[in-house]
């Protein structure tokens, strides 16, 4: 299939498809060009079949369209000389189609999928960094962007469309990538965007409240994540045994690797396991001692907080399960770097320690505050807000958490979007026992500045919610704004 051809592409599904040379594959009629294959799916917002005339006018070579309500599965029609092949359940088949189109890229590198509410980005980055230190050419795909380490290009969604994912992977293979760590979102699993990928390993970090505006309730959210193990080629399963959902899944996955820092492992029950035996937190990170099926060791980590110890142990267990030697992993561990905007520490002489983190769920905020507290000798400040046009139920929960775990809560705007900023802040304050104690400043830069300038040298200021993002969405406008740049400027350091 080196010269992409419609007949070869559809061979497993439509034996009598016509022969047509194909250039690119796209779901977007606006970018469809001469010689392309236009795939007309029925999505949540639009029916791609309405754009078939536009794609034909732009010179596409062939069209594959959803059959439901239009034609029978495998039916071939012709419109203005362009073959239109109808397939039923096209969304479910899209990953496999794109995989064939791009020559099955997940067969040509080691692909590790990471799913869970929190920790996906850090765990994927640690996997990519660590494998690269051991000689792989490593890449990441996810929230921060896609690409080879150090050459990551920002993206809109955690998991792109099924076609985007295969296309990106093929591009990485073309750049000689040998290892890729990919964040796998619950939306991506439900919408079959990674359905045909062959994962060498699949990591589960944890499950807590998020995306309930999409999934409806926690049971549906858990079911969405479980799809990675039940419906996909998941390879080695690496599961966080400290998470209640993780423990449930371990009971269903006898060959999985159980990972714990809270002694939730009985070596007699789990075939392969890794657990922390002692963790000492200090100014610049943590010293972690562990035992495992592969042997014991000690790691010096530059990452802050208990959950980052968990992320590091998950990455370590994954690489051990994939056959990387323990001695080599221990030798390179001290060279692992924190991830941009994930418990990222900014310091300057005589100034408070400032930590920028992406925490935007109740659980993540609690963990970030607990993590910052481990490294805090003075007062702990928390600057945060909640996004507009998103799950409103989490706002009072986050207010309550900030009040309980921080000494000073500063409530500000996050991405208000089309909601009234003050209404969002009021929802947050409603969760506090004594809202009068919280400082309220709608302007985010002003709120961050106020906290950093008022905090003392041995205080820690956690700026939560935006992490690596370099924009703020107000109304329908995307404004330039970065917590990292704001903090760096205040401390006189480089972001």
Curated annotation (Swiss-Prot):
A GO BP annotation: cell wall organization
Motif (Meso-diaminopimelate recognition motif): 414-417
Residues with PTM N6-carboxylysine: 225
UniProt cross-references to Gene3D superfamilies, sorted A to Z: Mur ligase, C-terminal domain, Mur-like, catalytic domain, MurE/MurF, N-terminal domain
Its job: Catalyzes the addition of meso-diaminopimelic acid to the nucleotide precursor UDP-N-acetylmuramoyl-L-alanyl-D-glutamate (UMAG) in the biosynthesis of bacterial cell-wall peptidoglycan.
Protein name per the record: UDP-N-acetylmuramoyl-L-alanyl-D-glutamate--2,6-diaminopimelate ligase
Residues bound to meso-2,6-diaminopimelate: 390, 414-417, 465, 469
HAMAP family xrefs: MurE
Location relative to the cell: Cytoplasm
UniProt keyword Glycosyltransferase present: no
Organism encoding this protein: Escherichia coli O157:H7
NCBIfam families per UniProt: murE, PRK00139.1-1, PRK00139.1-2, PRK00139.1-4
Entry similarity comment: Belongs to the MurCDEF family. MurE subfamily.
Pfam families: Mur_ligase (PF01225), Mur_ligase_C (PF02875), Mur_ligase_M (PF08245)
